[in-house]
Amino acid sequence: MKLAYWMYAGPAHIGTLRVASSFKNVHAIMHAPLGDDYFNVMRSMLERERNYTPVTASVVDRNVLARGSQEKVVDNIIRKDREETPDLVVLTPTCTSSILQEDLENFVERASQDTKGDVMLADVNHYRVNELQAADRTLEQIVKFYIKKAKKKGDLPEGKTEKPSVNIIGISTLGFHNQHDCTELKRLMADLGIEVNEVIPESASVHNLKNLPRAWFNLIPYREIGLMAAEYLESEFGTPYIDITPMGVVETARCIRKIQQVVNAQGANVDYEEFIDNQTLHVSQAAWFSRSIDCQNLTGKKAVVFGDNTHAAAMTKILAREMGIHVVWAGTYCKYDADWFREQVSEYCDQVIISEDNGEIGDAIARVEPSAIFGTQMERHVGKRLDIPCGVIAAPIHIQNFPIGYKPFMGYEGTNQIADLVYNSFTLGMEDHLLEIFGGHDTKEVIHKGISADSDLNWMKEAKAELNKVPGFVRGKVKRNTEKFARERGILDISLEVMYAAKEAVGA
């Protein structure tokens, strides 16, 4: 166990709760001490929706520790079933309450005798997996549960839909721009003449899960959530799945060609090449923009990328392949799936970093001094401290990355959003310089603390004034080089002379 003040992927129960609260009319009961019940607050604060978060904490307190949990947990399940009339109640412990080693399966069986809805225990090892793995596992478990139930009752629909159709699997609450991506994917499918059979888990009813096998294929836009459910549906019903993320012009075209191959193999006769050409040349502005003078100004500029596997890999490819930007390193916090990530990005960047340690990532950014960062909320903080602009491309994210306006990252509209994000994330040198000369909005205090440790150096007044004269787009670099020079020589007060000496040393 490791103590951390920042986690990229949360503990396992957060993943289970994300999936359970994404479904319609599903209630989750969290068997946990008070400190673990922050999910309700987090989701209510971040997700822009009107419904309350359907999660109840069955609190582990001293009475529970003295008498055992069964009575309390069973009572809570029955009470919620009566009050909310959910279709399903999902019980999940947390890593803390798992220490008690209680037979929660028995609690579920006991409670289900007195409930109208279904009751299920989330079958997740809280010490072995993180939020994303648990979400993937819980989604598969719920899908399995309802398909087996339908089989048992004999009301599993036979055969496929008449027209080509798709299940979009993995759209969930608290995901990065998930709702916008879902809307864009539905539009894309409609343009391709493909009906959307089901979208799970977001706003899906568990009673419709029995219809999943009717689709011609499954689309898994995010590698982190949905793969296990898709693999189960493939092994059980032979439904093929496509796990190519349609992010960027090249990957969107590759995804569409794969869809063409899959539906034609099942008796359809479609050709999407004309559609791809039309979208790439006329609808998406990204292909045109990448050849424009604006984008050529970015050619060769240095960037770093960090996030979950899906977004970090897609973004690395877009920057290197479609925009000519030099990706110094690309990284992911999904250590459990590191081999896939390496295979995807190694030819598009100089170095691959696999780490869950935000300090290590911050130091890696400070070391290479990129022109822009593309990462999570944490890298945004790092960028602010280093005075390096950052575009947020992956969860975990804060409120400003749950936009009310339409901002998908997938499909052809997504390519436009990404092009804007990339271009606006780079500080344009002349613009920055002119703003400071004419006293624009960007005349903030320039001395920032270092990323690895608090700055122990004192900048004298005349040195500070000289630093202010340096154009903003290189000021951070000048400051860091000067401080490095001073530290190496044991100088505590940085004067004009020290600045000039540092400049000469770097020049030499």
Swiss-Prot record:
GO terms for MF: 4 iron, 4 sulfur cluster binding; ATP binding; metal ion binding; oxidoreductase activity, acting on iron-sulfur proteins as donors; oxidoreductase activity, acting on the CH-CH group of donors, iron-sulfur protein as acceptor
Binding locations of [4Fe-4S] cluster: 36
GO biological process: light-independent chlorophyll biosynthetic process; photosynthesis, dark reaction
EC code: 1.3.7.7
Cofactor descriptive note: Binds 1 [4Fe-4S] cluster per heterodimer. The cluster is bound at the heterodimer interface by residues from both subunits.
Alphabetical UniProt keywords: 4Fe-4S, ATP-binding, Chlorophyll biosynthesis, Iron, Iron-sulfur, Metal-binding, Nucleotide-binding, Oxidoreductase, Photosynthesis
Pathway info: Porphyrin-containing compound metabolism; chlorophyll biosynthesis (light-independent)
The reaction(s) this protein catalyses: chlorophyllide a + oxidized 2[4Fe-4S]-[ferredoxin] + 2 ADP + 2 phosphate = protochlorophyllide a + reduced 2[4Fe-4S]-[ferredoxin] + 2 ATP + 2 H2O
Pfam families registered for this protein in UniProt: Oxidored_nitro, PCP_red
Swiss-Prot/TrEMBL cofactor(s): [4Fe-4S] cluster
InterPro entries: ChlB/BchB/BchZ, LI-POR_suB-like_C, Nase/OxRdtase_comp1, P-CP_red_C, Protochl_reductB, Protochlorophyllide_Rdtase
Assembly behavior: Protochlorophyllide reductase is composed of three subunits; ChlL, ChlN and ChlB. Forms a heterotetramer of two ChlB and two ChlN subunits.
PANTHER family associated with the record: LIGHT-INDEPENDENT PROTOCHLOROPHYLLIDE REDUCTASE SUBUNIT B
Protein name, per record: Light-independent protochlorophyllide reductase subunit B
UniProt organism field: Trichodesmium erythraeum (strain IMS101)
